[in-house]
């Protein structure tokens, strides 16, 4: 059974989503990049029908094991999103800590709307690229370099050189370089949403990511409204960006 500490990790996510959609057993939810299924379990506990996809077979196995141990049903599939097809249409799509890893973001946005039910919504969560650890450098094996803020903003050649100096593995360097290539900013996200017919129903920028509460015992804090309105500057202070979007053609 999931611990109360693990439950708290996702509390802010589900509380945020519940402001914009009524959740019931008839609500069908898809998570893209579901990992071990932690985001989906709170929705399953509310009786929703949940589906998760992930490219990593090991993560899908973890999700299936996790749900079985918790006593809830979930449908999980190992697949790349760009190869995913479904006869179902989803009232809610979850995209948490995924979009910043996608290289072809335009195609990603374009492929989403056919999966949305009429009046369906999408929840997005991602770290702004320029925030202190927007490059995910915390995955480094070297404890010193993993705690260096803003190192990912160095020019690519210098960034890779520094990582090699700290004896990071080639696979780690390649992963971090790929994240640098695929980076996502607040402004880029909002431009893509507009281009592909999505209206932004709500935006919440976090100065302290809600997930830091369980990881680092830091209380979640929203970004000050004045800072949230300052283009470019806000990217450096937003450790997590929550959005709710709707597709205009599905809400006419």
Descriptions of predicted regions:
Residues 1-10:
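Single conserved hydrophobic/aromatic residue that forms the stacking wall/gate
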Residues 4, 41, 45, 183-187, ...:
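A structural signal for well-ordered alpha-helical segments within the folded catalytic domains
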Residues 4, 88, 236:
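Structured loop/turn residues at beta-strand edges in well-structured enzyme cores
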Residues 7, 17, 233-235:
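S-adenosyl-L-methionine
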Residues 14-22, 27-135, 242-247:
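Conserved SAM-binding loop
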Residues 103-114, 121-249:
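S-adenosyl-L-methionine-dependent methyltransferase catalytic module, highlighting the catalytic core
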């Amino acid at each position: 059974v999931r611990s109360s500490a693990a439950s708290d990790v996702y509390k802010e996510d589900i509380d945020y989503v519940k402001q914009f959609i009524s959740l019931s057993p008839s609500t069908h939810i898809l998570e893209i990049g579901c990992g071990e299924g932690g985001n989906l379990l709170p929705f399953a506990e509310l009786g929703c029908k949940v589906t998760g996809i992930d490219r990593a077979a090991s993560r899908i196995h973890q999700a299936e094991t996790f749900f079985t141990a918790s006593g809830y049903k979930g449908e999980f599939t190992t697949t790349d999103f760009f190869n995913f097809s479904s006869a179902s249409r989803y009232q809610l799509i979850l995209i948490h800590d995924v979009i910043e890893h996608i290289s072809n973001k335009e195609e990603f946005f374009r492929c989403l709307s056919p999966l949305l039910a009429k009046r369906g919504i999408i929840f997005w969560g991602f770290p702004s690229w320029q925030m202190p650890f927007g490059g995910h450098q915390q995955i480094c094996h070297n404890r010193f370099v993993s705690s260096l803020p803003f190192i990912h903003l160095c020019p690519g050649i210098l960034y890779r050189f520094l990582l090699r100096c700290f004896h990071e593995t080639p696979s780690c360097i390649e992963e971090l370089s790929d994240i640098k290539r695929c980076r996502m900013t607040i402004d880029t996200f909002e431009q893509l949403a507009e281009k592909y017919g999505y209206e932004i129903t709500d935006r919440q920028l976090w100065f302290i990511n809600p997930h830091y509460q369980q990881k680092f015992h830091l209380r979640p804090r929203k970004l000050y409204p004045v800072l949230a309105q300052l283009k470019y500057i806000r990217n450096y202070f937003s450790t997590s960006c929550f959005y709710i979007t709707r597709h205009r053609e599905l809400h006419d």
